[in-house]
Amino acid sequence: MANTASARKRIRQNERRRERNVARMSRMRTFIKKVELAIQAGDKSAAAEAFKVAQPEMQRAAGKGVIAKNTISRKLSRLSARVKALATA
């Protein structure tokens, strides 16, 4: 239990930040799912468009510190490769 005013304030701040981070992470996952669904459906243009929309959202999450930058780079690279493979197939 927090005894000082500053500790209580930190608890409030942490809770607000956690809620924000959860929302950002959820939003990012939703965009990724849209890309993956388009890839599974075999829809080249929809996959490319969904990826185009998902990319800045994922980078924004990394910029805000919700997820590590290297993790986002890896995920973007793999998604991009899958979209590209779909376009050439």
Swiss-Prot record:
Keyword rRNA-binding part of the UniProt annotation: yes
Compositionally biased spans, kind Basic and acidic residues: 12-22
InterPro entries: Ribosomal_bS20, Ribosomal_bS20_sf
Domain of life per record: Bacteria
A molecular function GO annotation: structural constituent of ribosome
Gene Ontology CC: small ribosomal subunit
BP-aspect Gene Ontology terms: translation
Chain segments carrying region Disordered: 1-22
A Pfam family that the UniProt record links to this protein: Ribosomal_S20p
Function according to Swiss-Prot or TrEMBL: Binds directly to 16S ribosomal RNA.
Family: Belongs to the bacterial ribosomal protein bS20 family.
HAMAP family according to UniProt: Ribosomal_bS20
Name of this chain's protein: Small ribosomal subunit protein bS20
Organism: Gluconobacter oxydans (strain 621H) (Gluconobacter suboxydans)
Lineage, opening ranks: Bacteria, Pseudomonadati, Pseudomonadota, Alphaproteobacteria, Acetobacterales
Name of the gene encoding the protein in the UniProt record: rpsT
